[in-house]
From Swiss-Prot:
GO terms for cellular component: cytosol. SUPFAM superfamilies: Ankyrin repeat, SOCS box-like. Pfam families: Ank_2 (PF12796), SOCS_box (PF07525). It comes from Homo sapiens (Human). The SOCS box domain mediates the interaction with the Elongin BC complex, an adapter module in different E3 ubiquitin-protein ligase complexes. Belongs to the ankyrin SOCS box (ASB) family. One of its GO terms (biological process) is intracellular signal transduction. Interacts with MAPRE2; this interaction promotes MAPRE2 degradation. May be a substrate-recognition component of a SCF-like ECS (Elongin-Cullin-SOCS-box protein) E3 ubiquitin-protein ligase complex which mediates the ubiquitination and subsequent proteasomal degradation of target proteins. Plays a role in the inhibition of cardiomyocyte nuclear proliferation by mediating the ubiquitination and degradation of MAPRE2. ANK repeats lie at residues 82-112, 117-146, 150-179, 183-212, 216-245, 248-277, 281-310, 313-342, 355-384, 385-414, 416-449. This is Ankyrin repeat and SOCS box protein 14. The gene is ASB14.
Length: 587
């Protein structure tokens, strides 16, 4: 090989290096080009010939002008800031003649060059649904299987654009109908998902496998079932298998249930689909239909689902309907005989921070009054969860929800499992609201425990933080809570209401010191230092003999041999603010 270099060559190299150096210096000159946008910098390196070519390509009726520019061969290889060469520009123009001129002027090595998104000229023509351009490029040997950087093929792009003729053209020129694209999906996957019936027929006739599984294990049939495309499902069912499971063991019937099309569900059952195959999470098709609120699909699935499979799953469709706030589905399930007191299995409820168990808890958490009424009327028990349903309703301050739960036996004397107080926990949510406070007290709240203090008239021990122990909040007395600096102003009103529900009580020195500063102290002092009325004492005695559960039971009260006026008195109807239509209880 001849390694000789002439002086002329050295001079040319020197000139070239000097030009490059000056260009770089201009780019990094302070306060100027270094702050220029990236696309402007790239645009400045494009030749004038390139700009002329592109301008001519993008103007209609400029074939002759473009022909005169074909002599600038190197300009046809230049790319703009998004990687488009003139051939890419020509591929998306309506004028096929422009594309022919540009292709002939471009080096064959550029015919498969990609943009920054990995798109070839053919891919762009297909995406633009330009059939003549795509035909010309295919005739000149362009690859019909060249995928872009997202992993999509020209055939898949034709399916997405719903361009049947384009898809047929690509297949005729060798496009692989079984080519795996993004997430291992084929063109048949997309056609089935989008409901392109003619495309699905074309793919199947052209040799597409009917059951390819995507990265997540979905077949075209599963995707068609999700969207409820029954005609496509029937085509695929004749060709493929119904028993393919996704990577999470989700059956095709479960996917149909999630879509909610009753015809799709019925079709799969007709072809032998099993409604008792759970996915990895344990959910069955009936669970998914109930959770999504697909009433018609649920009607079909109820008779074909085994109760043993539901029990094994650890969750009832009643839970799902309540969680999704679908009272119509809930009513259907109750009418079908599903147990409203079915409790979540431990392996399911451990995924919830509150370890909820009952369907009623889901409904209460959603403030779904319709579902709560249905469940309680069907016999749902309100005291089955680690966190009491009443506590959730009190925290939300929902009067109607609280009233519903109390009328159906919610325990007003529950204790929180974490840091329990000496008095029942429900009271802490009602200190600022007389309506809620009266509700609790009317339904048998243990008011006497609020006045239970071992220190009596003695000086109370002081803590590191006023009102709280230095370690765990446990067995904290009412006097320690209500005398906190941010609650003291409520103490008089709260204690005055409580006195309507107790016999003679003694208040400790700590509580008394705070009450004496309240404007209502004189009334409280009068009640504490005088005998209670006989009528009041009789009411307390009757309530104690009846018990809390009998007090809230309308049937029991109806059989009680007492005048209605006396029954109302026993039930504290004169203090039933919610029943009287008073819905603002803030002090």
């Amino acid at each position: 090989m001849d390694n000789y270099t002439s002086d002329e060559d050295i001079d040319e190299d020197f000139d070239t290096q000097l030009i490059i150096q000056q260009s770089l210096q201009d780019i990094y000159k302070p306060g100027t080009a270094q702050h220029a946008p990236k696309d402007e910098s790239l645009h400045s390196f494009l030749s004038a010939d390139y700009k002329k070519i592109v301008e001519t390509i993008e103007k209609v009726g400029k074939e002759d002008a473009l022909s005169h520019l074909t002599k600038y061969h190197s300009a046809f290889g230049e790319a703009d800031e998004i990687g488009w060469i003139p051939l890419h520009k020509a591929a998306v123009q309506l004028n096929r003649k422009i594309l022919e001129i540009t292709l002939s002027a471009s080096d064959p090595s550029l015919w498969e060059q990609t943009t920054h998104n990995g798109e070839t000229p053919l891919f762009l023509a297909v995406s633009s649904c330009l059939l003549e351009n795509a035909t010309f490029l295919l005739l000149n040997g362009c690859n019909p299987n060249a995928k872009n950087f997202e992993g999509n093929s020209p055939l898949l792009a034709a399916v997405l654009r719903d361009c049947y003729d384009m898809a047929a053209l690509l297949i005729n020129y060798g496009a692989d109908v079984n080519l795996r694209c993004a997430n291992e999906r084929t063109a048949l996957h997309e056609a089935a998902k989008l409901g392109r019936e003619d495309m699905v027929k074309l793919m199947l006739v052209s040799g597409a496998h009917p059951d390819p599984q995507s990265t997540y294990g979905f077949t075209p049939l599963a995707l068609a079932a999700q969207s409820g495309h029954t005609e496509i499902m029937e085509m695929l069912l004749r060709k493929g298998k119904i028993f393919c499971l996704a990577s999470d063991s989700s059956s095709i019937l479960l996917e149909a249930a999630s879509g909610g099309n009753p015809d799709a569900v019925a079709l799969l059952l007709e072809y032998g689909a099993d409604a008792n195959i759970p996915k990895n999470s344990g959910h069955l098709p009936i669970h998914v239909a109930a959770d999504r609120g697909h009433l018609l699909a649920l009607k079909i699935l109820i008779p074909v689902t085994d109760l043993a499979a539901i029990k094994q799953s650890g969750i009832s469709p009643v839970h799902c309907a309540a969680a999704g706030a679908h009272p119509q589905c809930l009513e259907l399930l109750i009418q079908a005989g599903f147990d409203v007191n079915f409790m979540l299995d431990q392996r399911i409820n451990k995924h919830y921070d509150d370890h909820r168990k009952s369907a009623l808890y889901f409904a209460v958490s959603n403030s779904d009054l319709s579902s709560v009424k249905l469940l309680l009327s069907a016999g749902a028990l309100p005291n089955q969860d680690p966190v009491n349903c009443l506590q959730i309703a009190l925290r939300m301050g929902n009067y109607e929800l609280i009233s519903l739960l109390l009328r159906h036996g919610a325990n007003v004397n529950y204790f929180c499992r974490v840091n329990p107080l000496h008095f029942p926990s429900a009271l802490q949510y009602t200190l600022k609201d007389e309506v809620m406070l009266r509700m609790l007290l009317n339904y048998g709240y243990d008011t006497e425990r609020c006045f239970d203090c071992p220190h009596g008239d003695k000086v109370h021990p002081s803590y590191t933080v006023e009102g709280w122990t230095s370690t765990v909040i446990k067995d904290t007395k009412f006097c320690e809570v209500i005398t906190l600096s941010w609650l003291q102003h409520l103490s008089g009103k709260v204690v005055r209401v409580m006195l309507d529900y107790v016999d003679q009580v003694r208040i400790c020195s700590k509580l008394k010191a705070v009450l004496q500063k309240q404007g209502i102290w004189s009334e409280i002092h009068f009640i504490l230092t005088n005998p209670r009325s006989l009528k009041h004492l009789c009411r307390l005695k009757i309530r104690k003999c009846m018990g809390r559960l009998h007090l809230r039971c309308p049937v029991f009260m109806s059989f009680l041999p007492l005048p209605n006026r006396l029954k109302a008195y026993v039930l504290y109807k004169e203090y039933d603010l919610y029943g009287q239509g008073i819905f603002t209880g803030t002090w």
